[in-house]
């Protein structure tokens, strides 16, 4: 089963949209999702703070800012 990790920040509107899109295909495509708030994790906040949401699939960066759902599904299926 694939694992999706989303770096997010409190109050991030783009993060909410990305999470909703990813969750909309979660049951159909059968993958795990973890959402990690990076607000108080200095090294992650410094590295990714301006790029959230950051989406990883199986520990590899998939996307920043917005989710292209078609590409996401393609990558989840491979």
What are these regions (language model features)?
Residues 53-60:
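A short, hydrophobic beta-strand/beta-hairpin element that forms part of a small beta-sheet core
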Residues 1-3, 75-78:
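Short, Lys/Arg-enriched, disordered terminal segments
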Residues 48:
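Surface-exposed interaction regions that form or flank ligand-binding interfaces
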Residues 31-42:
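Thiol-based oxidoreductase modules, predominantly thioredoxin-like and allied folds used
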Residues 25-29:
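A short, Lys/Arg-enriched amphipathic alpha-helix followed by its capping loop at the start of a domain
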Residues 1-24:
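Local sequence-structure signature of Cys/Sec-based thiol-disulfide redox active-site neighborhoods
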